[in-house]
Amino acid sequence: MAGRHPVEEAFLAGRRALRLLVTPGRRDALERLVLHATTLRIPVVEIEGGSLTAVTGFDGHQGVALVAAARAPAAPADILARAIEQGEAALVLALDSLEDPQNVGTLLRSAEAAGVHGVVFPTRRQAPLSPAAIKASAGATEHLLLAPVDDLPGTLADMHVRGLRVVGTDAGASLTYREADLQGPLVIVIGSEGRGLAPAVRRRCDLLVRIPMRGRIGSLNAAVAGSVLLFEAAAQRGPGPARAGGQPNQTS
C-alpha cells in the first residue's frame, strides 16, 4: 500500500508490516511514520521516487509505501456477525462490477465513515483493490471487512433470506432516496459506472431509489451516488458511536 494515510491506518490497525519504503527527499516530512516503524523494529528502506512508482504501480505514493502481510478476505457471514457484535442493524455496501479504482476507493472511504459493517464485491469484472484504490480510500480498507464473492446475485439473495433488504439505485425509480426507509438491516448496491446494475443484480433488489437532479447533468458518478445513499442511511439510523477524527481532509 502507498500514501501517507493508508500507511498510517495500517499501523493503527495493527497490520503486520515487513518494511517501510520512503523516498530520501520526503523522509523529513514522513518523520512520524519513520519513527513509528523504527519503534516497531520495521526496517526502513530508502528508495528513489521513480523506483517507488515502479514498485507500487502508480505515482500518487507521496513518497511512502508499506510492504505488509496480506489480509485474509472476509466472508459475508463475517460482516453480519460484526453487526451483531456491535448491537447494530447490519449495513452492507455491495459493489456491482465497478471499473474505476478511484470510485472504489472513494466508496470504501465513505462506507467506513458512514458506519458500514462490511463490503461485498465480485471476484471478477471488478476494479481491484490496487494501491490507487487503497490511497483513494484514505486507509479505510484497514478498518472494513472486505468480502469478495464469486456470485454477487446469489450473495444478495442469501442476505435477503437472512433479513436484509437490498436497495439499488435507478434513475427511473419512482421513489427518491429521501422517501425510502433505509433503517433496519440493509444492503446498498452500487452499479458500475457505465452500465449501472446488472440485470441479475437488479432482480435481487427489494427496492430501487433515485437521487433527484436539479441541474442539467442527468446523473452522479458511482462514488458520489453511493456516498449520498450511505449517509442517508446513516442519518436515518441516528448517531453512532463517537470516533476519533471525523473532519474532512483535503490533502488526502
Q: Which ranges hold each PLM region?
A:
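Active-site helix-initiating loop/hinge in glycosyltransferases
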Residues: 3, 103, 219-221
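Short glycine-rich anion-binding loops that position phosphate/pyrophosphate groups of nucleotides
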Residues: 26, 52, 70-72, 98-100, ...
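Active-site/ligand-binding-proximal alpha/beta "capping" segment
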Residues: 167-217, 221-223
